[in-house]
């Protein structure tokens, strides 16, 4: 009989020996599996911690991006407000000076109406008047001469009414004194005579 036959017979004769060996084999196989499971669980735990940290960082990033957008918007608002203040200040500074010049324009215009065209000084007064109007226009000061327009209390001052059946009521018939605006701000309203229907 060979040794292997003897081992087989001895194993068959002694079943507890076979059970002990297979139990040891199972235990020795379970040790690496437990280690693997423990390592895997630690890795999962670490991954969950990292994912949680990533979520926190994403929330912080979104918060900082929102803060940045708000800061940029605030900066743009401040810039726009400052530019408007600068524009308003320059308009205000020019307004007082321009208002003083308007009486000179009115005087030159009155002189032109009273002078005859063949009068020797008419050409000089006309040239001075046109140059003054051009200077005002270069500084965004525009003349309001609203004949035929509908009366607008924002830009016109009614000094009188005149009956006119051909025109709609409150139509400007005559301009007594022209008005002026600087950019979109009223410098002086136009003094006007407006139409009315007969009673």
Curated annotation (Swiss-Prot):
Compartment(s) where it occurs, according to its Swiss-Prot or TrEMBL record: Cytoplasm
Gene name linked to the record: grpE
UniProt GO BP: protein folding
Biological role: Participates actively in the response to hyperosmotic and heat shock by preventing the aggregation of stress-denatured proteins, in association with DnaK and GrpE. It is the nucleotide exchange factor for DnaK and may function as a thermosensor. Unfolded proteins bind initially to DnaJ; upon interaction with the DnaJ-bound protein, DnaK hydrolyzes its bound ATP, resulting in the formation of a stable complex. GrpE releases ADP from DnaK; ATP binding to DnaK triggers the release of the substrate protein, thus completing the reaction cycle.
UniProt keywords, alphabetically: Chaperone, Cytoplasm, Stress response
Region annotation Disordered: where it falls in the sequence: 1-36
Name this protein carries in UniProt: Protein GrpE
Organism: Ehrlichia canis (strain Jake)
GO cellular component, one term: cytoplasm
Family: Belongs to the GrpE family.
